[in-house]
Amino acid sequence: MISLRRTARNILIVGSSHISVWVATFAFTVVQARYLDPSRFGQLALALAYAAFLLIFVDFGTSTLVSRTVAQRRDEQRSVIAATLLIRSVLWLVALPFLLLVSLVLGYDADLVRAILVLAIATLFVSWGGAVTAYLLGREEFLLPSLSMSAYRIVAAIVGIAILVLVPTPSLYLIACAFLIGAMVSAGLLFYALRGQTAIAWQIEPRRAVALLRSALPIGAYLVVGTFYFNVDLVMLEGMAPAENVGWYAAAYRLFKNATLVEAIVVARVLYPVFSRMSLGPQEELRVVIAKAMSFLAILGAAVVLLFVLCADGIVGILYSTDAYAPTANALRLLAPGLFFLYLNSVVCNALFALGYEKRLLVMAAVFAVLNVSANLLAIPRFMEDGAAAVTTLTEVGLLLWLTRLAPRDLLTGETARTVAKAGAAAVIAGVMVVLSGANTLLAMVPLALLAYGVAIVALRTIGPADLASIADLFGAGRPRRPATVPLGQPVHEEIAKSS
């Protein structure tokens, strides 16, 4: 199927271009943990959580709506970027005083408040760049958004690492400046590349902006509520536990978030515009793409969970400091299964957004916001960071159950459910084999776990012959193809040269 092959190739190439982003993010996180004690590391994570929530509020669903609208009716959206920029600028100006007021009311120290302010300014630049990115992704143009995201993460990492290494006891405010510089470079790259584009109308049309915001309201409300219950645990932990516990949980959660990069590339970057385009036609091709995406992410997600659960102590010891961050390992083990369900949830949720299910998804998010906060109120006082981690995983399980009930009956197939179950079973089998082997070092556990997992995947026939043939074709093992050229700045379907 041509669209499936194109989608798989786009995922591969966009994913390859984001390896540098992953490396830069991990390196910056490791250096932060090495040069900051757990309490200050936790404060920085808290500031980043506020910035993430602000970004979602400023976006307010416009990225999702713009990508979907452009994918479905691309020739009618010349002024959509200007309208999106106006919406985001106004929402940022409205939200900033409330953000600073909350910081002062909660009694944060001056350094943390300044860091939150700097990250808020960085968020404005990220949101401006995101407006352009949403438009380009809707056109299935991936080169420029990938370069922009890489520039943001790499520049922020380089500047941040330099500050941490060269400045004795750097302030959180100074570290936050690294993110601001990266955001400015990223946004500047996008707007410079689009200068002189006649296909884009830059004049401000307030009525168009109001209409766009009105259409985005259900999506924006969903994203705000969803971001709330995925970041509120860190805020609650900061108010209910010692600073060290906040740092331990933040360290585990940063690894958890970094591991979602694959999901962000596969689904948010590549698949969502495809889902939106396919939603206008027959459901068969959409169903096939969803099935293949869920199978791929289930197999990959189970492998990540396997390594995190088995190797948590070793990972924490290498990336952080065993003495200062030892409790992080158990929190990471409790968070890890949530990745498996998060990968699956992302596919179903984005498909439902493409089909226009945002109002039903908002109801789901509101219910889980109440459940998540209630569960954290019970778990954090008794289990601290471990309780917050367990609640995160249980939330993902509940979301998957709700989403599968919400999706149309013909959208998810029994074959996909069997593949997901087999991937989970293969991870359990591999984990038991590694434990029984007595291996206790990363050098021994990682290859043994992956080998055992691969054998179990094959033995359980998790991947069928047709899938293996598709993978072989994807990597060029099939019949030779004539190389294709990719015109810069044009819609790309055959070949391809992703926020705090």
Predicted feature locations:
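Interhelical loop/hinge segments that connect adjacent transmembrane helices in multipass membrane
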Residues: M1-T7, L172-A178, G188-F230, V270, ...
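N-terminal membrane topogenesis motif
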Residues: M1-A24, D75-R78, A82, D111-L112, ...
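Hydrophobic transmembrane helix module of multi-pass membrane transport proteins
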Residues: R88-V225, F230-N231
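Signature of the first transmembrane helix
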Residues: S3-S63, L96, L100-S103, A122, ...
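Membrane-interface helix-loop junctions in multi-pass transport and translocation proteins
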Residues: A33-F41, A110-V113, L117, R139-L147, ...
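Interfacial segments at transmembrane-helix termini and the short loops linking adjacent helices
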Residues: S103-L119, F308-F340
